[in-house]
């Protein structure tokens, strides 16, 4: 008896169904590094149009977390997809190396008692160690880049160019020195940039305080009264009692309506809109009378006594005054608030700051001298009670600024700092704020809501405090006049001389510099070296100049910056400001892409204390980096990205669908040589031509739309859908009969293999930006061997087909697919009650509208192959309907179809006539399916 299993084309796949990614990925990485894949790619891509994604530098401290992984994976997908789209897309990874967190770690490890030069040396060593750890993890994720030559903000050349960027801004006229209130962290002992501030809820005392008017006659006149008897008070409301020792004025809104109200306390001035609530707080319900009303502009320049100090307090008009809460009058301490500073500055009131850098009151402040500000609140409340000026006291929970490092509340504190002015006219007569808002207009945003967010932040941001009183940072390399505080008139030239020294020896060249090396003897007498360092956001915000503009393989401006949504107030903004404030005069990027934060499966923020942290190292060690990459790509990054073991298991199912599809494709291509065996497009079996069109449409969608607009979750969805629906549930299901049962080198089979070759090659190229390991594994089989890379090739070139012919082909086969779905649905009850096993055991009678019936009948005897039944008949009717029944034919041992001609050919007693022809004759011919 013949064993017909040996006559079918069941081939082994060179692409295993099990990826075993966690184990195999490290070996692939080693091989690619040894082959110098990145360097070869740069050679291959020479002369192509450039695409520059500039890497926002992660901070060189601690292991990478899942947010870092998302960020680097998204960047890598873009770099790879742009490369395959025909661009030269070099990727230079970078690290942010200066700043307080590293200082804190070095102090913990080595203590504080050492020369500053040694301290900076240890900071540099610590940063280098952290970079080595993080680099290893980024490479493990499959991120392709120039890892042997990353940029570091602590590289001597980068430090020098950061100094040069400072010089650019100085020459543009935006840099100035001023004593202004800035966000100040008492634990850092330093001012903070906006990006270093986070807001959390805090419980604070909320108090109403009375300021006694000195001249009641003047107050009466302001309210249009001839006079009145008794005392009168302006009442303020504040949540920062500790600022009252610095109170220098009270501000009223010029257009706000105020009432003079007679109360048991005396006459009180309160905003009309807030008076009722305020009086309730004071417990005044009886003996109240509204005497008169006036507007805030009439109260201007009246004078009061400070509630517990001997100090004159003028009434000012301030635009910052609102009637949202409180009393409508605002106690004004220019040392502790930007708006307070602005209004006092307008009135020429000299700033008084009673709080030192440790957050303690200086010696001349009674009762609270030497205390830290937070300790002073209860003392000040007691003081107010003693003077009779505390009208109400309660607790309030409100959003308050905290240090992002220490998680402790910040204070506003006036200090002498260097600023980049937002509203100061530069050398070209334009303000930096106007330039930056114009730059926002010129930038493309992904997602689009990023534009409004960044614009609002630029419109509302204060001047940028760029100086820091720290040790491990790029120095502000200026010489300052000892008496006037003015910069040396030759600052631009001196700065360049210092930059050249820093290029050779790093920032230590400035800290160890003897003034006499650059200044005359007279200037040495009159000028001091500035000891301040620069805000680390200035370092990273200058990398478009220190890296993108300097490195030969890059081009300025960058095409894309891609970071988390917090970078609208961080790197996106600092980069824009340095770009606009320098001679470049524009944003250093054309596009901004923002991704959300990673949360757990329930949408909760990750926290070690909760125990819901998912570490990227755990994911790639268990599942493989390709699964992590597929998760990142399949999630809509414009919002929060949820991750958990359950979510990763679902992602693994999608991966398995893609992998199993590739395994099947490669098995059926293992005896196919595209040069010798390919069938011309016009000669292919019709369904093969249709399948190639579907593959080409998928490629056009991904390569022409989803990848260029960074819509990776749509790309993944369509790839999985193509594998499971277009291929798995339709084309490959139909194709198995022809692949397995026709002659190995027949036209029917070679046509199918030609289609599979185009589909496979395109599919591998399409998945490769996302599944970089799997893509390369597959390319080893279908590409040019182990030394070849999928990245060395652009998108697949499909055979051309006439547009009209294609449209007709798609229309026809869309109708056939609809009929096939109806047939499958009609057979399902027969399978459920075990009347039939597979659909091949069934016959179908189809009633279809005329056009569909025409398409079905055009397939003739091959219709049964397209419908996966043993027999099919079609008749015309008004709507689609299918009647299915079990076939009365006999099962062919070879093809498993049920026919009435099994054993019809002598010597082939257990197989059908078609199989007998395919085994012993010339083989069958197919035209349609």
From Swiss-Prot:
Its EC number is 6.1.1.5. A motif ('HIGH' region) lies at residues 58-68. It is found in: Cytoplasm. Its main location: cytoplasm. ATP binds at residue 608. It holds the Pfam family Anticodon_1. L-isoleucyl-5'-AMP binds at residue 563. One of its GO terms (biological process) is isoleucyl-tRNA aminoacylation. Its cofactor is Zn(2+). A motif ('KMSKS' region) lies at residues 605-609. Binds 1 zinc ion per subunit. One of its GO terms (cellular component) is cytosol. Zn(2+) binds at residues 892, 895, 912, 915. InterPro entries: aa-tRNA-synth_I_CS, aa-tRNA-synth_Ia, Anticodon_Ile_BEm, Ile-tRNA-ligase, Ile-tRNA-ligase_type1, Ile-tRNA_ligase, M/V/L/I-tRNA-synth_anticd-bd, Rossmann-like_a/b/a_fold. IleRS has two distinct active sites: one for aminoacylation and one for editing. The misactivated valine is translocated from the active site to the editing site, which sterically excludes the correctly activated isoleucine. The single editing site contains two valyl binding pockets, one specific for each substrate (Val-AMP or Val-tRNA(Ile)). Catalyzes the attachment of isoleucine to tRNA(Ile). As IleRS can inadvertently accommodate and process structurally similar amino acids such as valine, to avoid such errors it has two additional distinct tRNA(Ile)-dependent editing activities. One activity is designated as 'pretransfer' editing and involves the hydrolysis of activated Val-AMP. The other activity is designated 'posttransfer' editing and involves deacylation of mischarged Val-tRNA(Ile). Monomer. NCBIfam families: ileS (TIGR00392). Belongs to the class-I aminoacyl-tRNA synthetase family. IleS type 1 subfamily. This is Isoleucine--tRNA ligase.
């Amino acid at each position: 008896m013949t064993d017909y299993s040996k006559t079918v084309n069941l081939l082994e796949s060179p692409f295993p169904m099990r990826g075993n990614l966690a184990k195999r990925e490290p070996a692939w990485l080693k091989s690619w590094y040894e082959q110098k894949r990145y360097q070869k790619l740069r050679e291959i891509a020479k002369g192509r149009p450039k695409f520059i994604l500039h890497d926002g530098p992660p901070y060189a401290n601690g292991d990478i977390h899942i947010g870092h992984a998302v960020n680097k994976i998204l960047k890598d997908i873009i770099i790879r997809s742009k490369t395959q789209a025909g661009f030269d897309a070099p990727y230079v990874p970078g690290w942010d190396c200066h700043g307080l967190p590293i200082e804190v770690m070095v102090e913990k490890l080595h203590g504080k008692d050492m020369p500053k030069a040694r301290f900076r040396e240890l900071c540099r060593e610590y940063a280098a160690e952290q970079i080595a750890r993080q680099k290893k993890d980024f490479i493990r994720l499959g991120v392709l880049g120039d890892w042997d030559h990353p940029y570091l903000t602590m590289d001597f050349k980068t430090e020098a160019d950061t100094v040069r960027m400072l010089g650019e801004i100085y020459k543009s006229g935006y840099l100035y020195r001023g004593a202004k209130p800035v966000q100040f962290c008492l634990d850092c002992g330093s001012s903070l940039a906006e990006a270093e501030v986070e807001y959390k809820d805090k419980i604070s005392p909320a108090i109403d305080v009375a300021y006694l008017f000195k001249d009641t006659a003047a107050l009466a006149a302001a309210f249009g009264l001839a006079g009145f008897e008794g005392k009168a008070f302006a009442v303020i409301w504040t949540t920062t009692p500790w600022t009252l020792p610095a109170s220098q004025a009270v501000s009223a809104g010029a257009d706000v309506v105020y009432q003079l109200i007679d109360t048991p306390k005396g006459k009180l001035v309160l905003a009309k809109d807030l008076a009722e609530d305020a009086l309730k707080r004071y417990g005044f319900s009886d003996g109240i009378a509204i005497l008169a009303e006036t507007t805030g502009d009439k109260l201007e320049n009246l004078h009061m006594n400070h509630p517990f100090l001997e100090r004159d307090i003028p009434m000012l008009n301030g635009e910052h005054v609102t009637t949202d809460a409180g009393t409508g009058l605002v106690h004004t301490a220019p040392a502790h608030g930007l708006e307070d500073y602005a209004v006092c500055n307008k009135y020429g009131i000299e700033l008084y700051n009673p709080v030192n850098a440790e957050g303690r009151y200086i010696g001349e402040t009674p009762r609270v001298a030497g205390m830290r500000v937070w300790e002073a609140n209860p003392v000040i409340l007691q003081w107010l009670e003693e003077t009779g000026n505390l009208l109400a006291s309660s607790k309030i929970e409100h959003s308050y600024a905290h240090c992002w490092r220490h998680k402790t509340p910040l204070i506003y504190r006036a200090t002498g700092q260097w600023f980049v002015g937002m509203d100061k006219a530069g050398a070209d007569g334009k303000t930096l704020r106007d330039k930056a808002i114009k730059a926002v207009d010129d930038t493309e945003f992904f997602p689009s809501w990023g534009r409004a967010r960044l614009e609002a932040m630029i419109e509302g941001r204060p001047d940028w405090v760029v100086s820091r009183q720290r040790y491990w940072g790029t120095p502000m390399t200026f010489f300052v006049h000892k008496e006037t505080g003015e910069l040396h008139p030759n600052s631009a030239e001196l700065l360049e001389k210092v930059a050249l020294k820093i290029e050779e020896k790093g920032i230590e060249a400035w800290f160890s510099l003897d003034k006499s090396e650059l200044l005359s003897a007279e200037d040495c007498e009159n000028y001091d070296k500035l000891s301040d360092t620069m805000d680390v956001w200035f370092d990273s915000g200058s990398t478009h100049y220190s890296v993108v503009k300097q490195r030969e393989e890059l081009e300025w401006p960058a095409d894309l910056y891609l970071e988390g949504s917090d970078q609208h107030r961080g790197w996106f903004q600092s980069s824009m400001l340095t770009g606009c404030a320098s001679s470049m005069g524009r944003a250093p990027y054309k596009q901004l892409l923002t991704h959300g934060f990673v949360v757990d499966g329930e949408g909760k923020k990750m926290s070690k204390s909760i125990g819901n942290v998912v570490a990227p190292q755990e994911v790639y060690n268990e599942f493989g980096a390709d699964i992590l990459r597929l998760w990142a790509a399949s999630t809509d990054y414009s919002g929060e990205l949820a991750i958990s073991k359950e979510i990763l298991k679902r992602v693994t199912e999608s991966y398995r669908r893609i992998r199993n599809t590739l395994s099947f494709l490669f098995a059926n291509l293992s005896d196919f040589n595209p040069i010798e065996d390919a069938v011309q497009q016009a000669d292919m079996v019709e369904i093969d031509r249709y399948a190639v069109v579907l593959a080409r449409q998928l490629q056009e969608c991904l390569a022409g739309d989803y990848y260029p607009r960074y819509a990776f979750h749509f790309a993944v969805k369509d790839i999985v859908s193509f594998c499971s629906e277009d291929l798995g549930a339709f084309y490959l299901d139909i194709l198995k009969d022809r692949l397995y049962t026709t002659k190995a080198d027949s036209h029917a089979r070679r046509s199918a293999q030609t289609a599979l070759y185009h589909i496979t090659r395109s599919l591998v190229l399409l998945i490769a930006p996302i599944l970089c390991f799997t893509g390369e594994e597959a390319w080893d089989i279908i590409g040019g061997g182990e030394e070849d890379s999928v990245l060395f090739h652009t998108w697949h070139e499909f055979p051309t087909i006439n547009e009209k012919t294609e449209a007709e082909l798609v229309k026809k086969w869309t109708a056939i697919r609809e009929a096939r779905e109806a047939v499958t649905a009609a057979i399902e009850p027969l399978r459920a009650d075990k009347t039939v096993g597979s659909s091949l055991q069934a016959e179908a009678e189809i009633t279809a509208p005329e056009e569909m019936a025409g398409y079905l009948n055009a397939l003739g005897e091959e219709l049964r192959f397209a419908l996966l039944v043993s027999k099919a008949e079609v008749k015309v009717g008004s709507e689609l309907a299918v009647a299915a029944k079990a076939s009365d034919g006999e099962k062919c041992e070879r093809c498993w179809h049920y026919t009435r001609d099994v054993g019809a050919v002598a010597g082939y007693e257990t197989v059908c006539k078609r199989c007998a022809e395919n085994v012993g004759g010339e083989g069958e011919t197919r035209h349609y399916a």
